């Protein structure tokens, strides 16, 4: 289709006789994301590109493109747009550009793109590296790399008829033309690359410079071998120079990789500069080849004195440059140069406190290190040991050149003794002739000493130590056993059972026959009844004796019990002793030793005082402290039942008990409150107050308290007299009967209720709901409050099975001995066709009682608050309800 359009346009041109000039941009502006061609405003301008794959075949897969032209300052700026990314801009030198004249809408697409003077050249060009002379693939990145060039060949100045191969399928829509891989064949030197094939825009490039990785000289064969890369294969293109002097006698012994220079000999030590140039491309930095000094022997000096070191060998002096003097190092120390010939050198070595063995020696001429064919190294004087002794746990060694703590090491070994390293010892600093160290525990008496300084071991020395013991436990106060480790035994003879004498005892107690392990012998010895710390004893084994000390085990408490009457604490444990004068007992830091009632080694009885609080118990026996304190929890104490005037509400009444430790978790001390020998319900509780709810309806309550099975305070509570706060209108439901809801406080379910109308008395049956919900308590002093409502009153629901015809009557109520009588209004209620009637929750018309209001005596604590709350509600006095939060009942 596109070809037909082009032919049609050409045909129109020929018919009209119109001839269009080729596009001649005066400039091009471009970067990696856009390009603009600039034309004179009165001349033809470009409209689009037709990129070709080759000389004759356009790119059919190419997305549409166009130039968006506009006049800017009298010039026509044509910005190129394409529906595919710029990384896909590629085409041959035969690509076409379409042109339009300013005065004609006809588009002419016959012009060669190569005819454009200005167009985007390669931009932001980068190479992954330069190619080796042996040839390799190189990655080239940049913009417009294949615009008007290639695409799969890159023309070069080495041979324009043999372009480099560009890898990749350019017709693949995913192929990135800004990132191409080019195969460079083997070659050398500098050349030019032509990315657009016009020949007008050469880009200089070259093969990689020669690289020298190593060099080896063979003086016997007078050959120097140079290893590296990029030496190419043609000797005529290569130049080799040593210290600026060309070397004609060389061959390329391995293509690209190795050059061998023949007939070269040098007697002086030091560096030599090597330069290689391949096809006018030189090595980037001259390589330094070293002719090393050769060391065959070296003398030794004392490490703590200055000394002259003599080195023998070859190339130890420069005959060509007398000012070239070496730097000499022995280990990490400098040996100051004195003089030298080609075969012998002298230098001065300062004192070296660390010394050393087999230290490396280096004679460096101008940066070139020496070599030694027989591995010559330097060693300071060898240490010697002449004698050794043991006294009071300290070993002393006598010798020479013993070095310092940092460079020396000591190891002990022997029959029956595992190898033991001594990490802490002291060498005399003035003459290095003595060493002292603390002898560690050894199983056997005789041992060998291995002394090493800087890796040099002195002659082995043998020493014997005297008997020693180590106590490893603390015996109990009674029937105690002392475990003793034995060191420095005579392992060559059979030992009899040792004995122990404690304190001022006149008799010794036999111990067990020592048993052995890899580190020591062990025996067990009995100890007499006793307490305290640092007790002296004498240990005897065969003919040797040694003195030491031990401490008895500290007191410990395992558990506690409380006496049946609750008056005493019994602490059970160990090592309490039997003397009250030697024991101290502290509770919460206070001394309670005076309250000790009984004392035995395993039990301690203490009287309980009201002032005691839960806390840590600390016991000392004869100056011996407990390892860990015992936390003492005390049983609950009930002080009294605190209801004021021994009163409580009749309906769901609360009973308040005061005391301490009321929250104990011990089942044996659980606090329980009973009313008329019946269990009560816990309403609220903390360490000092317990509030329970009584569920009975009896007129008086005999309240008893218990701590576990032990009884506590008891009393008899009576109910405050009932009080009515609200009498609603009586509902008279036809066919259902009479319903009356009465609200108040301290109602009982022992009552008689009736409604008198005219001369007829209608008996009423009543149901009672107590007011106090199980998560509320009345209070008048808390900031977290809500107003009291009818939900906080007792609710009495009374009804009959028959209705009445009257509109008024007298309601009679009798609670035990307290009676109430009210004139009431009776309201007839008609039932709906589909009734769903239950206990009414909505307030009906109500009336406040005008007479018969009776209030019993108020009670203390919560009971009193309830009575006060009832009064407050009746007289509309502000009152609050406090919520219990976080309590578990």
From Swiss-Prot:
Alphabetic keyword roster: Cell junction, Cell membrane, Glycoprotein, Membrane, Repeat, Signal, Transmembrane, Transmembrane helix
GO cellular component, one term: protein complex involved in cell-cell adhesion
Start and end residues of each IPT/TIG domain: 120-207, 293-380
InterPro entries: Dictyostelium_Tiger, Ig-like_fold, Ig_E-set, IPT_dom
Signal peptide: 1-19
Record membrane topology: Single-pass type I membrane protein
Ranges in the topological domain labelled Cytoplasmic: 873-889
Side Extracellular, residues: 20-851
Residues that span the membrane, as ranges: 852-872
Record's subcellular location: Cell membrane; Cell junction
Knocked-out gene: effects: Mutant cells are unable to sporulate in isolation although they will sporulate when in the presence of wild-type cells. Cells form loose aggregates before disaggregating. After starvation, cells form wide streams that frequently break and form secondary centers before reaching the primary center and display cAMP relay defects. Cells fail to rotate. tgrB1 and tgrC1 double mutants show strain segregation in chimeras with wild-type cells. ComC, tgrC1 and tgrD1 triple mutants fail to form spores.
Stored SUPFAM superfamilies: E set domains
GO MF annotation list: identical protein binding; receptor ligand activity
GO annotation, biological process: aggregation involved in sorocarp development; altruistic, chimeric sorocarp development; calcium-independent cell-cell adhesion via plasma membrane cell-adhesion molecules; cell-cell adhesion; cell-cell adhesion via plasma-membrane adhesion molecules; cell-cell recognition; cell-cell self recognition; heterophilic cell-cell adhesion via plasma membrane cell adhesion molecules
Function: tgrB1 and tgrC1 are involved in kin discrimination. They play an essential role in aggregation and subsequent development. Could function as a non-diffusible cell-cell signaling molecule that is required for multicellular development. Has both cell-autonomous and non-cell-autonomous functions. Terminal node, epistatic both to comC and tgrD1. Activates tgrD1.
Matching PANTHER family: IPT/TIG DOMAIN-CONTAINING PROTEIN-RELATED-RELATED, IPT_TIG DOMAIN-CONTAINING PROTEIN-RELATED
Protein name: Tiger protein C1
Lineage of origin: Eukaryota, Amoebozoa, Evosea, Eumycetozoa, Dictyostelia
């Amino acid at each position: 289709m596109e070809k037909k359009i082009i032919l049609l346009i050409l045909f129109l041109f020929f018919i009209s006789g119109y001839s269009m000039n080729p596009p001649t941009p005066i400039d091009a502006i471009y970067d990696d994301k856009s390009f603009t061609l600039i034309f004179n405003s009165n001349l033809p301008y470009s409209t689009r590109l037709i990129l070709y794959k080759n000389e004759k075949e356009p790119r059919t897969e190419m997305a549409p493109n166009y130039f968006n032209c506009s006049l800017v300052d009298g010039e026509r700026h044509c910005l190129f747009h394409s529906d595919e990314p710029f990384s896909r801009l590629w085409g041959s030198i035969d690509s076409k550009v379409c042109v339009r004249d300013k005065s004609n809408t006809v588009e002419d697409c016959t012009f060669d793109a190569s005819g454009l003077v200005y167009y985007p050249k390669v931009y932001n060009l980068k190479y992954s590296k330069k190619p080796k002379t042996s040839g390799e693939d190189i990655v080239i990145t940049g913009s417009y790399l294949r615009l008007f060039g290639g695409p799969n060949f890159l023309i070069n100045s080495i041979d324009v008829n043999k372009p480099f191969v560009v890898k990749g399928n350019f017709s693949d829509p995913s192929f990135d033309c800004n990132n191409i891989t080019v195969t460079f064949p083997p070659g050398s030197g500098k050349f030019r690359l032509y990315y657009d094939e016009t020949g007008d825009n050469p880009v200089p490039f070259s093969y990689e410079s020669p690289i020298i990785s190593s060099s080896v000289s063979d003086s016997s064969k007078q050959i120097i071998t140079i290893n590296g890369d990029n030496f190419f294969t043609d000797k005529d293109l290569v130049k080799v120079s040593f210290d600026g002097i060309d070397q004609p006698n060389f061959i390329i012994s391995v293509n690209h990789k190795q050059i061998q220079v023949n007939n070269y000999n040098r007697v002086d030590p030091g560096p030599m500069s090597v330069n290689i140039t391949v096809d006018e491309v030189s090595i980037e930095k001259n390589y330094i080849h070293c002719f090393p000094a050769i060391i065959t022997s070296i003398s030794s000096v004392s490490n703590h004195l200055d000394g002259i070191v003599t080195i023998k060998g070859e190339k130890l002096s420069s005959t060509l440059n007398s000012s070239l003097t070496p730097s000499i190092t022995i280990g990490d120390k400098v040996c100051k140069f004195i003089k030298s010939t080609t075969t012998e050198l002298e230098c001065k070595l300062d004192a070296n406190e660390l010394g050393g063995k087999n230290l490396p020696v280096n004679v460096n001429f101008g940066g070139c290190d020496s070599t030694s064919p027989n591995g010559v190294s330097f060693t300071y004087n060898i240490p010697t040991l002449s004698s050794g002794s043991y006294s009071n746990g300290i070993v002393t060694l006598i010798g020479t050149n013993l070095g310092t703590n940092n460079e020396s090491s000591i190891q002990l070994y022997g029959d029956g003794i595992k190898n033991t390293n001594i990490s802490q010892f002291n060498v005399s600093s003035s003459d290095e002739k003595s060493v002292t160290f603390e002898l560690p525990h050894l199983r056997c008496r005789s041992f060998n000493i291995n002394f090493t300084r800087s890796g040099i071991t002195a002659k082995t020395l043998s020493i014997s130590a005297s008997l020693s013991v180590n106590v490893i436990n603390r015996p109990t106060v009674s029937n105690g056993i002392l475990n003793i480790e034995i060191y420095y035994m005579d392992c060559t003879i059979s030992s009899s059972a040792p004995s122990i004498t404690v304190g001022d005892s006149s008799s010794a107690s036999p111990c067990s026959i020592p048993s052995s392990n890899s580190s020591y012998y062990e025996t067990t010895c009995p100890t007499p009844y006793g307490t305290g710390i640092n007790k002296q004893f004498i240990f005897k084994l065969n003919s040797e004796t040694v003195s030491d000390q031990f401490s008895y085990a500290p007191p410990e408490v395992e558990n506690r019990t409380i006496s049946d009457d609750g008056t005493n604490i019994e602490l059970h444990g160990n090592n309490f002793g039997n003397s009250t004068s030697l024991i101290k007992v502290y509770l919460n830091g206070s001394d309670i030793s005076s309250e000790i009632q009984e004392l035995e080694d395993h039990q301690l009885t203490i009287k309980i005082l009201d002032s005691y609080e839960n806390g840590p118990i600390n016991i000392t026996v004869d100056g011996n402290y407990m390892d860990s304190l015992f936390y003492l929890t005390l049983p609950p104490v009930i002080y009294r039942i605190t209801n004021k005037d021994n009163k409580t509400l009749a309906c769901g009444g609360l009973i308040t008990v005061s005391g301490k430790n009321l929250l104990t978790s011990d089942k044996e001390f659980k606090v329980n409150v009973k009313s008329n020998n019946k269990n009560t319900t816990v309403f609220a509780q903390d360490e000092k107050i317990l509030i329970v709810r009584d569920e009975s309806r009896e007129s008086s309550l005999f309240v008893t308290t218990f701590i576990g099975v032990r009884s506590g305070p008891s009393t008899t509570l009576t109910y405050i007299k009932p009080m009515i706060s609200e009498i609603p209108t009586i509902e008279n439901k036809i066919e259902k009967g009479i319903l009356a809801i009465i609200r108040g406080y301290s109602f009982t379910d022992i009552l008689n209720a009736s409604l008198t109308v005219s001369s007829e008395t209608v008996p009423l049956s009543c149901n009672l709901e107590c007011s106090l919900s199980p998560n509320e308590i009345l209070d008048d002093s808390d900031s977290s409050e809500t107003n009291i409502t009818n939900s906080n009153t007792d609710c009495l629901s009374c009804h009959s099975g028959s209705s009445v015809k009257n509109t008024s009557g007298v309601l009679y109520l009798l609670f035990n001995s307290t009676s109430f009588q009210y004139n009431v209004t009776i309201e007839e209620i008609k039932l709906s066709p589909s009734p769903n009637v239950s206990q009414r929750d909505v307030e009906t018309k109500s009336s406040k009682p005008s007479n018969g209001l009776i209030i019993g005596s108020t009670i203390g604590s919560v009971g009193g608050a309830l009575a006060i709350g009832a009064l407050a509600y009746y007289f509309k006095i502000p009152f609050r309800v406090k919520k219990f939060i976080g309590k578990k009942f």
